Amino acid sequence: MREPGSERVQTWLAAQDAKACAISDWVFTEFSSALSIKLRNGQLAEAHRATALANFTMLATQRFAVLPVERQHFRAAARFADQHALGLRSGDALHLAVCADQGATLCTLDRRMAQAAKALGLMTEVP
């Protein structure tokens, strides 16, 4: 299942140091949700969903540092979401809160999220 920008992201990831990249525990929820939506909409077969989920889980645990999502991240995400002009969805606000807490650079293909991150003073990279 190829998404727009998949090859560009794969090339970018391959060039990164093995443990220099991190994701939060929230990414597991978002990935599972995205696969379930595609399954419900008929864009993905159950067997492909299971394979994609297994591959993602293996990649995520072997290639990335996994950051916990804690109470303070939800509170910070709410403060970010309160800034209505940023146009943040709750999940994106949570990603940004974890990035802000860790002093991490956000890597995303979502231009709106990247703009919001910059407005909040976070470093961003768009592969």
Residue ranges and their predicted role:
Residues M1-V27, K38-A54, L120:
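Short, well-structured N-terminal submotif of metal-dependent ribonuclease cores
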Residues A18-C21, A65, A100-T105:
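Short active-site oxyanion
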Residues I23-T29, G91-L94:
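Aromatic- and histidine-enriched alpha-helix N-cap/loop-to-helix transition segments
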Residues S33-R40, D101:
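Short glycine/serine- and small hydrophobic-enriched flexible loop segments
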Residues W26, L53-H84:
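Acidic catalytic patch
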Residues M58, L94-L96, A100-P127:
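Acidic, PIN/NYN-like endoribonuclease modules and their adjacent C-terminal/linker elements
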